[in-house]
Curated annotation (Swiss-Prot):
Spans traversing the lipid bilayer: 279-299
Signal peptide: 1-25
Role noted for this protein: Acts as a direct positive regulator of leaf size but not leaf shape.
Protein name: Protein STRUBBELIG-RECEPTOR FAMILY 4
Disruption phenotype: Plants show a reduction in leaf size, but no apparent defect in pollen development or fertility.
Other information: Cannot functionally replace STRUBBELIG.
Subcellular localization(s) per the UniProt record: Membrane
Record's bilayer topology term: Single-pass membrane protein
Region ranges (Disordered): 239-269, 310-329, 344-365, 378-398
Gene3D superfamilies: Phosphorylase Kinase, domain 1, Ribonuclease Inhibitor, Transferase(Phosphotransferase) domain 1
Domain notes: The protein kinase domain is predicted to be catalytically inactive.
Residue windows of the LRR repeats: 96-118, 119-140, 142-165, 166-189, 190-212, 213-235
GO cellular component: membrane
Gene of this entry: SRF4
Length: 687
């Protein structure tokens, strides 16, 4: 081999080596973007050596605290670095991350709602995080260590621990968590350590009774009641002080309850099995005798009374003066999970019977396919009035003007077709113009949706809507209820709706810049936040779509059609093709998280300029969510999704962050969608 050839070979080998090292070191683009976002959200701390707010190679350049496997980030260890700010909203993109330790910093805000589902170790302790434990924890099937102690977490824990068999340690101590322990704690068969001290938990700790490996429990300084299970009294460490435990002997567990004998060797010999079976049979027999005796006593009591065995007089259809049984004075008997009793009420001077579906399982006694009974102080009923109720009190409509039917007919040309602005599931909307130049939008409610037997229902609706005031809500001006016709009068917006700007073809309808779109999204989110978190009781909109987002002269959003959710139960029409969340097979299934999904679809419209459902497109692209969802996390295809009307005039980082917010809003599982307050905070960062 000649010298020239040798030189060429050496150069080739050197170049190949350099090329190979670069290829191997190149970090996955989604991982880079997620770390860039986290770095910016933490206020770009100089203490994190090598980190960058844009681009970079975390794996190849060995960013501080980052461990990789191949081109994927697998570990983040940045404990005790004095970090501030938040963690951003893209950590869920780190698909290979198994270890996350951000403890002992000054991080604040909500924890990312979507965390990597391959985490085995999660430590966010000793920070200033608020909000709640992210529901995405429920998807971490390999998680063994969870420590979010010594923060400012608040609210009730979601029932999300069903599928975490490898979880050995939970530390949620020194927060402001409330409510009862999730029943799914009983599924944590691998749990060894549980620290819940210094919170505001209440109820019993019976869910911990049969955990086979539990050896360290600290529930001190909460508001727990009931008895400490005997099964926990023999574990290695048990701290229970500062609660409201019951005194005296604890009641026996119900028949059939699984019992964990912590003093046995685990062999499970035949004698112990026989003893356990004997105990179960004995307890069951005694329970059966007691139940039988109770039934006899009840039958005897009923025979000695004049009351029927029904809640209502079957012949006259009137309520009985006495309830089926009388609980303590000033308490309410509530039936949960019993649709058949939905409208039945018995009234007594000391007690009331309310029947409604249960949102949370708070049952004290429950039977499969049967109602659940609770005793709740009746004062709670008055403390949380229902806006949709039709009480005997006269509705307050003093804040709005009562228009005559003649006035509205004159100003709307007798509701002629040329004054028709639109038609929805509830009724038609007309434009009304008064002689003094004032313009209003008049919404006539479909008469079939108003119960004829309750003439005051419309007045209650007016009273409810007139009490809602927010700068991003379309204001109710007045109403009309004459000759069987019921109308709501709103302020009129000459700019029309967001739907008009995004989806109509004329040039006038496409002036929305990217910054304007973000501002529209933020204003709408604030309006929804007002309904969900400020109104008392909270309201669900149930019909969020771009045609219900009106724009004023400065293109500020005004959410309309609020306060009418009760009507959506009475119509079989689709509330908005492409907007409905997957769980909403009918209008009654809507929740606040369904509103978040619908708003996510509106954000997709702002991002892409496409309709939520477009039958004119190829089949794979007709459903906006189905088409866009897989591409929202792909940096290479995201630019191709953006509305062509923007002509490329936007910051890629802003679009990427906007897409991340959209992706968690349109999650299929309702529990994985963020509360709208989280969405508001995320959008604020983009303005």
């Amino acid at each position: 081999m000649g010298p020239n050839l040798q030189r060429i070979v050496l150069v080739f080998i050197a170049c190949f080596g350099i090329f190979t090292s670069v290829v191997l070191a190149k970090t996955d683009s989604q991982d880079v973007s997620a770390l860039n976002d986290a770095y910016k959200s933490m206020n770009s701390p100089s203490k994190l050596k090598g980190w960058s707010s844009s681009g970079g190679d975390p794996c190849g350049d060995s960013w501080d605290g980052i461990t990789c496997k191949g081109s994927s980030v697998t570990e983040i260890k940045v404990s005790g670095r004095g970090l501030s700010g938040s963690l951003g909203y893209q950590l869920g993109n780190l698909k290979s991350l198994t270890y996350l330790d951000v403890s002992k910093n000054n991080l604040n805000g909500n924890l990312p709602y979507q965390l990597p589902d391959k985490l085995t170790y999660l430590d966010g302790s000793e920070n200033d995080f608020n909000g709640n434990v992210p529901y995405s924890v429920s998807l971490m099937n390999d998680l063994s260590y969870l420590n979010l102690g010594r923060n400012n977490l608040n609210g009730e824990l979601s029932d999300m621990f069903q599928k975490l068999p490898k979880l050995e340690t939970i530390d949620l101590s020194s927060n402001q968590l409330t409510g009862k322990l999730p029943q799914s704690f009983a599924n944590l068969t691998g749990l060894k350590t549980l620290h819940l001290q210094e919170n505001q938990f209440k109820g019993s700790i019976n869910a911990l009774r049969d955990l086979p490996q539990i050896d360290d429990v600290n529930v001190a300084n909460n508001q727990f009641t009931g008895w400490i299970p005997n099964e926990l009294k023999n574990i290695g460490n048990l701290e229970t002080g500062g609660n409201k435990w019951s005194s005296g002997r604890a009641p026996s567990p119900p028949p059939g309850t699984r019992h964990i004998d912590r003093n046995s060797s685990g062999g499970g010999g035949g004698s112990s099995k026989a003893l356990t079976l004997g105990v179960i049979i004995a307890v069951s027999s005694i329970g059966g005798l007691i139940l039988f005796a109770g039934l006899i006593a009840l039958i005897s009591r009923r025979k000695n009374s004049n009351d029927s065995s029904h809640f209502f007089d079957d012949e006259k259809g009137t309520n009985r003066s006495k309830p089926l049984f009388t609980p303590q004075s000033s308490q309410m008997l509530q039936f949960d999970n019993m649709e058949e009793f939905k409208n039945q009420k018995t009234v007594d001077s000391n007690t009331s019977l309310e029947t409604k579906p249960s949102v949370k399982r708070t049952s004290s006694v429950s039977f499969k396919n049967s109602p659940t009974f609770h005793l709740i102080p009746s004062t709670q009923v008055a403390a949380t009035p229902d806006r949709s109720s039709t009480s005997q009190d006269s509705p307050d409509t003093r804040g709005v003007k009562a228009f005559s039917l003649a006035d509205l007919q004159n100003t709307a040309s007798c509701f002629s077709p040329n004054r028709l602005l639109g038609e929805g599931t509830i009724g038609r909307v007309y434009k009304a113009k008064f002689q003094d130049g004032r313009k209003f939008a008049v919404k006539e409610i479909d008469s079939s949706l108003l119960g004829k037997g309750n003439p005051e229902e419309f007045s209650h609706i007016v009273s409810s809507i007139s009490s809602i005031h927010h700068k991003n809500m379309a204001e109710l001006v007045g109403y009309c209820s004459e000759q069987g016709r019921n109308m709501l009068v709103y302020e009129y917006f000459t700019s029309g709706s967001l739907h008009r700007f995004l989806h109509l073809s004329d040039d006038f309808s496409k002036p929305l810049t990217w910054n304007t779109r973000i501002r529209i999204a933020l204003g709408t989110a604030k309006a929804i936040e007002y309904l969900h978190e400020t109104c008392s009781p909270p309201l669900v909109h149930k019909n969020i779509k771009s045609s219900n987002i009106l724009l004023d002269n400065e293109l500020n959003p005004r959410l309309s059609d609020y306060g009418l959710a009760n009507f959506h139960h009475r119509t079989s029409q689709n509330l908005g093709v492409g907007y409905n969340a997957p769980e909403c097979t009918d209008p009654s299934a809507y929740t606040q998280k369904s509103d978040v999904y619908s708003f996510g679809v509106v954000m997709l419209e702002l991002l892409t300029g496409r309709k939520p459902y477009d039958s004119g497109r190829p089949k794979a692209e007709q459903s906006l969510v189905r088409w866009a969802k897989p591409q929202l996390k792909d940096m290479d295809t995201l630019d191709e999704m953006v509305d062509p009307a923007l002509c490329g005039l936007y910051a890629p980082e802003s679009v990427s962050s906007f897409a991340d917010i959209v992706s968690i809003c349109v999650m299929t599982e309702p529990g994985l969608r963020p509360p709208v307050s989280n969405v508001v905070e995320a959008l604020k960062r983009l303005v």
